[in-house]
Amino acid sequence: MSCLPEPTVLTQLWVDNPPRYSQAQLQDYLKVIKLPQRFLNSAVLKDSSLAHTKEHGLPLLKAITRYHACNVPFENLELHYSAHKTITLDPVELFEKIVTRRRGGRCMENNTFLGTVFRSFGYEVRDCGGRVARAMSPYPDVRKNQAYTYDGWNHMLNLVYLEDEWYVVDVGMGSMGPNLPFPLRHGFETMSIAPRKIRLQRRPIAESHASNPTKGTELWCYDVCLKPTKDGTEVWIPTYAFTETEFLPQDYEVMSWFTSTNPRSFFTRYVTCTKMIQDEEKEEIIGNLTLFKDTIRETIGNQRKVVRECKTEEERIQALVEIFDVNLTDEEKNGLPEERRLA
């Protein structure tokens, strides 16, 4: 029998009092992501009703998404360095973590927070769920033998409505994510981080009990092509699939619990941290910096190089400060279990 007291309230969406950030909080956030003055002059910031328009709402949506990806890391440090090893998806606590403490988070943290930011600016936002493709698995045997399959529901993204169509907004897939808003259209294809291309298709996934795979339930499938060609021989990598169904906080509570506690989860096994790199003059993302376990790599276009190899835990903590602007507290530095520490 559990010795915990019975809960008096369970997770839900508080429809009568939905989470929003104050104007002062939003201004603090825009400083954290270093949004340039030309975007701070957006008419949306003076009249929130304009957030629904493509003329005013879309440019600001693109800018905030890009600057967020380049200044708020995709990281799982809480699961390794914190004393509690737990994740919160409460928007109030996420503001404290991301804006006050200058940290980041995984998909559900980053996209819950950013969705709340956009709603606070007046945007119409729907939270959705996805399945990450096993072609993205960090485990070689899984990539080799199960690349055509998908995980269970373990990813979060946002849909933002502008005038007459939805736009996909996702800052929670690290270096393989779109990191730019794009329309929810079957067959849509665009360059994301040159020369990389992304596409969106509505199709059944391979796993289905349907007698004919083509009769399976269709999902929106987001794919990435790392090396586009002109002869039609492009290789598209399944990245994740998602549905337009609205997911609620209690859905993400279940999803986050699994991905943050399961010993087979990528997040519980490896320390990782990613920030995107942008060319501010061209207003586009050109690459990323990623820490994976003990190595930091910089990728610009299709060129990748090792920036730093960390031999000790002290070196990894210092690299988080110098390269990712992430400062762990003394408690966090001592929170990593001995068996996970670098020698």
From Swiss-Prot:
A GO MF label: arylamine N-acetyltransferase activity
Catalytic residues of the enzyme: 107 (acyl-thioester intermediate), 155 (proton acceptor), 170
Pfam assignment, any one: Acetyltransf_2
Deletion consequences: Significantly reduced growth on medium amended with BOA or 6-methoxy-2-benzoxazolinone (MBOA) and no growth on 2-aminophenol (2-AP). Leads to the accumulation of 2-amino-3H-phenoxazin-3-one (2-APO), a compound resulting from spontaneous oxidation of 2-AP, when grown on BOA-amended medium. Results also in reduced virulence.
Gene3D superfamilies per record: 3.30.2140.20
Keyword Acyltransferase: yes
Keyword Acyltransferase belongs to the record: yes
Pathway note: Xenobiotic degradation
Entry keyword set: Acyltransferase, Transferase
EC number(s) from the headed UniProt entry: 2.3.1.-
InterPro entries: Arylamine_N-AcTrfase, Arylamine_NAT_domain_sf, Papain-like_cys_pep_sf
Expression induction: Expression is induced in response to 2-benzoxasolinone (BOA) exposure. Expression is also induced in response to 6-methoxy-2-benzoxazolinone (MBOA) and 2-aminophenol (2-AP) treatment.
Top-level taxon: Eukaryota
Family: Belongs to the arylamine N-acetyltransferase family.
Function: N-malonyltransferase; part of the Fusarium detoxification of benzoxazolinone cluster involved in the degradation of benzoxazolinones produced by the host plant. Maize, wheat, and rye produce the 2 benzoxazinone phytoanticipins 2,4-dihy-droxy-7-methoxy-1,4-benzoxazin-3-one (DIMBOA) and 2,4-dihydroxy-1,4-benzoxazin-3-one (DIBOA) that, due to their inherent instability once released, spontaneously degrade to the more stable corresponding benzoxazolinones, 6-methoxy-2-benzoxazolinone (MBOA) and 2-benzoxazolinone (BOA), respectively.
Protein name per the record: N-malonyltransferase FDB2
Primary gene name: FDB2
